[in-house]
Amino acid sequence: MTGRAMDPLPAAAVGAAAEAEADEEADPPASDLPTPQAIEPQAIVQQVPAPSRMQMPQGNPLLLSHTLQELLARDTVQVELIPEKKGLFLKHVEYEVSSQRFKSSVYRRYNDFVVFQEMLLHKFPYRMVPALPPKRMLGADREFIEARRRALKRFVNLVARHPLFSEDVVLKLFLSFSGSDVQNKLKESAQCVGDEFLNCKLATRAKDFLPADIQAQFAISRELIRNIYNSFHKLRDRAERIASRAIDNAADLLIFGKELSAIGSDTTPLPSWAALNSSTWGSLKQALKGLSVEFALLADKAAQQGKQEENDVVEKLNLFLDLLQSYKDLCERHEKGVLHKHQRALHKYSLMKRQMMSATAQNREPESVEQLESRIVEQENAIQTMELRNYFSLYCLHQETQLIHVYLPLTSHILRAFVNSQIQGHKEMSKVWNDLRPKLSCLFAGPHSTLTPPCSPPEDGLCPH
């Protein structure tokens, strides 16, 4: 391949976790990934295929047959904060990770997620492995801890629903192993296994299944997905602001009601010159004090709408953005990894051939020429393997591009959740406002235009005159 291919808890629990995060000094994630033994290109075909394979229709194995509903139904994983601080000297943040599919509930630390992701990248370097959120930041607060929990939940759900990852032993270990040494178990599962290229029976024939215009197709797909990412990033930002405004509106309504109650509860005596209006002022204070209940209810409804849109709209947008970002990261790995290595190997081979021609022309010693010939043969084998990996990387990229398109209907789910939230929120708020109107009418319904306290019927919201 030449040229450009593709672009790349409750509040108490959160608060306790924020304190723990400030002192967290977890063990550094081990980077000693197991290194598979080198295998000649001719022997690759004889590798025993891994038991887990992408679901493929009869015919071209490059094409996938999945629906969004099938992917979403594979598993739903919950990630919740555990506020307890463990360790004699070091304090950590722990998460309870629960899987519907495996009917399991295990405790995991952030570094367990790191090793889990490392094993996925080790075994599946040509697939969309989602990124992890940052480990920590100085003075980590409740918002950071909660944002990281949400990001870890999105990460593990994307992995659990991936057609290939979902059938791998690494995922099962992470979601169901209840021992204390889960990191070692994850590493052991990858020892001497090698990556997907060494285990896939189609790896050496990947080129045969790729379309002739693969470069043009991927250039178009890359541009499309880049545009989709940029648009969804803006949608997410707007959705965040809409949800945030609903929560801010709730806070303002609550304060508004409290101030009305404060006015109604004021006991400061009236001056003598205002004694004639004392009854009017007293009635008005009673009325204002009674209205605070409705404003508290309005605040509650607005807060519910904001939280619902955070969970059902913003989080779904973040999930899709995480998926798109993993695709961009995959493209970058392809260009900076296998493609770059292939090009360097070709350049090195070209230099060797020149040296060989020069040695032959200068009649160098036979031993020197034989050594150079041996190195050239080794380089040819390396180039052959890299070329096979390059085509297999393109093969996987093509399938991952298909998965992105399978997830595109998630847009309709997000829009439906947003519209339903707006309808429900406005409907509930409208009902409370309408219930409030009769009470305002009561303020002006007294005899001789004297203000009377608002009536607060418990059920029907009607105010008898």
Swiss-Prot record:
Domain PX: residue ranges: 73-181
GO molecular function, one term: identical protein binding
Protein family according to the UniProt entry: Belongs to the sorting nexin family.
Keyword entries, A-Z: Endosome, Lipid-binding, Membrane, Phosphoprotein, Protein transport, Transport
Biological process, per Gene Ontology: early endosome to Golgi transport; intracellular protein transport
Highest taxon listed in the record's lineage: Eukaryota
Segments for region (Disordered): 1-36
Composition bias type Low complexity, residue spans: 1-19
Amino-acid positions noted as binding a 1,2-diacyl-sn-glycero-3-phospho-(1D-myo-inositol-3-phosphate) in the UniProt annotation, renumbered to this chain: R109, K135, R148
Known role: May be involved in several stages of intracellular trafficking. May play a role in intracellular protein transport from early endosomes to the trans-Golgi network.
Compartmental location: Early endosome membrane
Any one Gene Ontology cellular component term annotated for this protein: cytosol
Record-linked Pfam families: PX, Snx8_BAR_dom
Membrane-topology annotation of the record: Peripheral membrane protein
Organism: Homo sapiens (Human)
Record flagged with keyword Membrane: yes
PROSITE patterns, A to Z: PX
SUPFAM superfamilies assigned: PX domain
Modified residues (Phosphoserine): S456
Modification sites for Phosphothreonine: T452
Keyword set includes Membrane: yes
Name used for this protein in its record: Sorting nexin-8
